[in-house]
Each structure stands twice: as structure tokens, then as C-alpha cells.
Amino acid sequence: MTGSENAAGKAGLEARARRAAPPENELQDDRWSYFGWAERPYFQAMRRFRYDIFRPLLIRLGRLGLRPNHVTVASFLAVLVGFPLFWGAKLYGWAFAALALHVILDGFDGPLAQALDQHGTAQGALMDMSNDVTGLVIVILTVSYFNAGAGPSVNVFIGTVYAITYLYLTIFAVAQNLLDIRYAYVVKTKYPVYILLLCKWLFAFDLATPVMALASVYMGLSAFFGFLRVARTLR
């Protein structure tokens, strides 16, 4: 066997090994997330389901030069620019369309990375999580402070507390994962709140505010106990 054939065979084996390693990569990915151990099988199953459904499209997009970080940035810009701009102009339908685009694109970066054999990187997981959390904060602060008291806006105090407790919950959930501190799950209220905000606009019926108030209490307590577990581990 020639040297070039040997090198080609070795490269092929390495490529197959990389493709055969999703579980290990997924574990690395999950460390940079706010999912507990009981949630991870569901999270991974949903990620694989999205990949299986959209695999032909994802591969085609990858061949056109689209990369996961491009999708993440586009998702972030939709919620950073589109949502506050339309909400401030009282174009609530367009604001929710921008939010829907943010959510849809946010669900595509992971499967696209998997289609390109780039899944499981800590950098990609960090960008994805930052997009999730920052998007939530932008949405909540926008609906709290823009057009306050009008339309489908929410109480300023409750909205602010909700955004702050969500941030602290995320910080200590991720810290526990990075320190290998086991916790079962974290109740995530982001998507239910988005849906309730949409319902408030469509039907003028406000369930978003009381749900956010209750969720803030839960997230504050979860963040506090997460802080205690992290502090004990760092002694």
C-alpha cells in the first residue's frame, strides 16, 4: 500500500470516528446548557428528530455555505432588532412574526451543525444558549417598558423581576452542569410565556402576568438553591 493510500485510509477512518461520536459530543454540548440530567434524553431526542426531518434541507444549505453561527446570528438579530422595533411602533403582529422567526432559526443551528459534522462544540453551545437567554430578556423588557400600560404590554415590575430571575436561574444551572453537580430538571417557562403574550394580544386576556409572577418565585428559589450547591462544591 502506498503512502498516499495509507493516509487516505487513515483520514477515512478518522472521519467515520468523528461521525460515530455524537453521544460524547452531546455530553460536551449539554454541559453548556441549562438542562438537568432528567431532561437531557428528551432534549437529545428532539434534536435528533429535527435533524432527521430536515436533514436533506440542512445538507443543501450547508453546501451553499451556510454555517450554524450564521443561523444563530440571524436568529439573534430578529429578536434584537425586529421585535423591539415593531413593538415600539405598535405593530404587534410584525413583532410576533419577528419573534417566531427568532424561535424557528434558533431551532435550526444545532441540527445544521450536526449535518455538517460540527455538532457538540462548546463554542456553538455557548452561542446558542446566549441567543436563547438574551432573546428572552429582550422580549420581556420590551413588552414591559415599550408602550407600558397599553396593548399587550405587561407590568413593568413583574417583567423586570422575571427577566432577572431567569438570568440567575440560567447562570447557576449552567454552573452546576460545568461542575458536574447533578440536578434533575429546570422548569422552563420561556415558550409558554411567549404563547401567553401572543394570546394577550389576540384575545385581550392576560394570563402572562400572573404566570410570570409565579415563575419568578420558582426561578428565584431554584437559582438560590443552585447557588448554595455551587458554593458548597467550590469550598
Give, region by region, the residue ranges found by the protein language model.
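Acidic active-site catalytic centers that drive phospho-/nucleotidyl reactions
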Residues: 106-109, 128, 132
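A short, mixed-charge helix-start or loop-turn motif at secondary-structure junctions
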Residues: 39-43, 64, 120
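Membrane-embedded alpha-helical segments that form the functional core of polytopic membrane enzymes
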Residues: 68-123, 207-216
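A feature for the membrane-embedded catalytic helix bundles of lipid/isoprenoid biosynthetic enzymes
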Residues: 2-58, 129-235
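Residues at alpha-helix termini
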Residues: 64, 116, 178-181
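Membrane interfacial helix-start motif at the N-side
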Residues: 55-68
